[in-house]
């Protein structure tokens, strides 16, 4: 009898604990759903497609890397790759656009090319701005372009640069991880 009472008490206690957990979860659902709804409405669902389209329209002229160099873009740091998550490619940076401290969808600071022997294929762009310059002129808020918030690359960083904000847009090569993710596993530096 003692054994049965102990087992019954144990089962009742476990049941009460499970019911308490369930009650807490049910009570939190409205708050979790509200956070989810805010997160979903914080970005315009058309923005990714719109930003990719705008970038393609403004960079079509740079499909030929020679047009990029004629427009003031030049290779910076060689082909950037990661050990287990693809690559970024070769960044052709326009230092004049970087130095102006502004962001303009029609004038990305960097064009990203994938090397193929002595040729280059345009795969995306990177918008860049010095963080101190941007924050001083924009009420200490990070840049946002068509609903996409830029990432801060702090110092020290692998490029030995002062802190900067950046946003990749894979407009010319699909990225399974997303159009605005830094690394693209469909881009490679092996073709150099």
Residue ranges and their predicted role:
Residues 10, 21, 110-112:
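Functionally constrained cores in energy, signaling, and assembly domains
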Residues 2-5, 30, 75, 149:
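Intrinsic disorder/low-structure terminal segments
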Residues 40-192:
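Primary mode marks residue(s) on the alpha4-beta5-alpha5 output face of response regulator receiver
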Residues 1-17:
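N-terminal secretory signal peptides that target proteins for export/translocation
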Residues 34-39:
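Boundary at the C-terminal end of the N-terminal hydrophobic targeting segment
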Residues 21-31:
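Bacterial N-terminal signal peptides
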């Amino acid at each position: 009898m003692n054994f049965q009472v102990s087992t019954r008490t144990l089962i009742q206690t476990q049941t009460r604990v499970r019911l308490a957990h369930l009650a807490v979860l049910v009570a939190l659902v409205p708050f979790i759903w509200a956070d989810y709804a805010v997160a979903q409405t914080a970005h315009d669902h058309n923005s990714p497609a719109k930003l990719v389209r705008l970038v393609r329209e403004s960079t079509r002229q740079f499909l030929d890397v020679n047009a990029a160099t004629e427009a003031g873009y030049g290779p910076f740091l060689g082909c950037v790759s990661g050990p287990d998550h693809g690559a970024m490619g070769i960044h052709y940076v326009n230092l004049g656009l970087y130095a102006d401290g502004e962001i303009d969808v029609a004038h990305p600071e960097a064009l990203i090319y994938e090397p193929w022997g002595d040729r280059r294929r345009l795969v995306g762009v990177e918008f860049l701005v010095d963080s101190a310059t941007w924050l001083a002129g924009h009420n200490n808020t990070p840049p946002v372009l068509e609903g996409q918030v830029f990432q801060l690359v702090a110092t020290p960083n692998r490029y030995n640069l002062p802190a900067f904000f950046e946003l990749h847009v894979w407009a010319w090569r699909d990225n399974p991880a997303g159009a605005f993710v830094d690394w693209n596993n469909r881009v490679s530096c092996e073709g150099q």
